[in-house]
């Protein structure tokens, strides 16, 4: 039985959309018979409607005393041990759950992941890894928002985790690139210049060199490493462009008979495109480098995104992501 701790109180749309996503997932579990139990952590009044699932063994209800606001400081998150996020993290630490899913504040979840759940050996800072759609299937963007400021040695660890994550997802001999304002070796701040040399030494032929923002979706490399500040801006920009494309196609299809006929003719293709570009499809992203599965859902997640975030966590447990990553990182820690 896989046990997933879900923070019902985290996110811009909490608790209603988080609860709705949990209900959707529970219905799927009942239908498919998957061996998954949700450990729902929230304020007392948010847990009531899940009581009837207890007799079926589909849920465990854990009461929290408070919800962390979305603007909470990471250090405050660690002090508020009665919050839903902290309690859910503690459940993973104590092996009472295999994973935590939260749409709460990223910095707060990073603090809980790092200092409550704990880090893998040799990892200084966990990082948010996002598989981004590309012309070459996908590109791993790491860090996508966890660490706004980084040290150049952290970027080496991010690259190592990104490479091994890409291998787990099926990439053979993945190439890593450093996000920069140009491809020349001398581009960027001192941080990027130092990181470039260290990446070159550490990964040899696996290091492609500097890459630019457009290379992420082109798929020039399999892993793009950067600080969380630049990574988050890049990710949010791509989300905005995806919405623009979807909206433009929809609007143009309505303007003429040719557009309507074209939309009907290519409806299946357009649906696939929309699904691929929709951030909700991917649900959530892993904090890599943590000694447990920690999935960060988008702060603005709706029920569909939460459903998919839970599924991401389940697949992470089933695929033994933490165990594989821990084993693969040993080569870098010698």
Swiss-Prot record:
Gene Ontology CC annotations of this record: cytoplasm
Cellular compartments annotated: Cytoplasm
Major location (coarse): cytoplasm
Keywords: Cytoplasm, Lipid biosynthesis, Lipid metabolism, Phospholipid biosynthesis, Phospholipid metabolism, Transferase
Domain of life: Bacteria
Catalyses which reaction(s): a fatty acyl-[ACP] + phosphate = an acyl phosphate + holo-[ACP]
Pathway: Lipid metabolism; phospholipid metabolism
E.C. number(s) listed in UniProt: 2.3.1.274
A Gene Ontology biological process term: fatty acid biosynthetic process
Task of the protein: Catalyzes the reversible formation of acyl-phosphate (acyl-PO(4)) from acyl-[acyl-carrier-protein] (acyl-ACP). This enzyme utilizes acyl-ACP as fatty acyl donor, but not acyl-CoA.
HAMAP family: PlsX
Protein name, as recorded: Phosphate acyltransferase
Source organism (scientific name): Fervidobacterium nodosum (strain ATCC 35602 / DSM 5306 / Rt17-B1)
């Amino acid at each position: 039985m896989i046990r997933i701790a879900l923070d019902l109180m985290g996110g811009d749309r909490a608790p209603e959309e988080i609860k709705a996503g949990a209900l959707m997932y529970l219905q799927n579990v009942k239908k498919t018979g998957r061996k998954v139990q949700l450990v729902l952590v929230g304020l007392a009044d948010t847990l009531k409607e899940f009581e009837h699932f207890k007799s079926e063994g589909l849920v465990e209800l854990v009461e929290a005393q408070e919800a962390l606001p979305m603007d909470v400081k990471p250090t405050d998150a660690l002090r508020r041990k009665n919050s839903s996020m902290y309690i859910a993290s503690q459940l993973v630490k104590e092996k009472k759950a295999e994973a935590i899913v939260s749409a709460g504040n990223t910095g707060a979840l990073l603090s809980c992941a790092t200092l409550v759940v704990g880090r893998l050996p040799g990892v200084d800072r966990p990082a948010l890894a996002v598989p981004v759609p590309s012309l070459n299937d996908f590109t791993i963007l790491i860090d996508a928002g966890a660490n706004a400021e980084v040290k150049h040695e952290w970027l080496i660890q991010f690259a190592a985790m990104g490479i091994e994550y890409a291998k787990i997802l099926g990439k053979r001999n993945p190439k890593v690139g450093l996000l920069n304002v140009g491809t020349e070796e001398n581009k960027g701040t001192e941080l990027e210049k130092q990181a470039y040399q260290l990446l070159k030494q550490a990964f040899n032929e696996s290091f492609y060199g500097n890459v630019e923002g457009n290379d992420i979706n082109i798929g020039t490399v399999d892993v793009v490493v950067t600080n969380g500040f630049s990574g988050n801006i890049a990710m949010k920009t791509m989300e905005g462009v995806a919405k623009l494309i979807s909206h433009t196609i929809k609007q143009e299809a309505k303007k003429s008979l040719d557009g309507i006929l074209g939309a009907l003719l290519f409806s299946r293709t357009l649906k696939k495109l929309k699904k691929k570009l929709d951030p909700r499809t991917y649900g959530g992203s892993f904090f890599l480098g943590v000694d447990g599965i920690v999935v960060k859902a988008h702060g603005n997640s709706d029920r569909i995104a939460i459903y998919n975030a839970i599924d991401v966590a389940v697949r992470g447990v089933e695929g033994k992501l933490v165990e594989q990553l821990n084993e693969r990182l040993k080569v870098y820690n010698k």
